[in-house]
């Protein structure tokens, strides 16, 4: 994660610090004019002086200020660069170029490079948490972990709450396998308002997902503590609540997950994730229907409604309320006639009922056009072709379904066995029928 750039308050962009130039009779008029904001009069004097003395660093510096005042920023920055080339020991030149670059997007790499050069050339002057963190990050990128650790620790000794340094140091500890130090350091990043919760939840989820069985046994409680830290810091943030629920699912705690997603539905009833997770966490069809119907009272986004319509249609079909099932499939397709998942599910249910097979085939074919390698869609289409007695083509699509991941799916194997039997390939049909029943 990039260390966020701060333009420190004492970096004054168009500073007219006298430098040693005020003692230069050739420069004094230019400086006095600039101090009086008379850039148009100062500019030709600076240009004239550069023609006479092209190695006069101060003349380049002040000409750059004149260009900047006129809005010719590229010329200004080139002048500041030339001043640095002529006198690399003058930190004022670095400062003005640094701030000039920082004023625009697209110069981040140049600004970081310049800041690192300033740190290295003038260490006592720029020994701040920001510069030390920037230096530490650069050293990490160049595999100088020991130096990086020193500078990041120095940054935190100056400001223990400086999140960029804490994050970089924690990551350094994690990659080194020093998990005790990691768990001590990373909360500073998680509790800081320096970064948005979107960044923090995304980062923490990536860390959590790396936990396998062994690491969970060793660090489970400490990983839980990180999630709790984030949730306590932002108790009503939707992303933090969602993360806590997903972590409980990931670690096999569905009841705790359900509580988090119930909170999410309560705090953010128009956020579909809470309803969808609750829908799938319950094993009761009756409760699923209740959750889905309640969700429809709050959700307004088209894609969210389609998802709930599709889920409700499947549950209603399972409970035998087929008219409601087909009603919700139709509602979903009115919102998006090309939704591949809805088309496939609707077509498959029609095939199970042996009704409207022509319509089912058309919908299934449309879903396959969107996702030609989807094993479930291939199975649906192949099975419908079987029901319509197009056995040769049914075999082609069901074989594709097996190739694309359906080789362990009992329904796919069963449908393929039916097709083989219809084609008279009894021995192979028996083989797949037996596999489908294991």
What are these regions (language model features)?
Residues 35-36, 69-70, 103-104, 141, ...:
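Register position in tetratricopeptide repeats
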Residues 52, 86, 121-125, 158, ...:
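Structural marker of alpha-solenoid helical repeat scaffolds
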Residues 31, 65, 99, 137, ...:
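Residue-level recognition of tetratricopeptide repeat
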Residues 62, 96-99, 134, 168, ...:
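Canonical tetratricopeptide repeat
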Residues 19-62, 74, 78, 85-90, ...:
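N-terminal leader/linker segments that initiate helical-solenoid repeat arrays
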Residues 23-24, 57-58, 91-92, 126-130, ...:
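Helix-start (N-cap) detector for alpha-helical repeat units in TPR-like alpha-solenoids
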Residues 48-49, 82-83, 118-122, 154-155, ...:
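Canonical positions in the second alpha-helix
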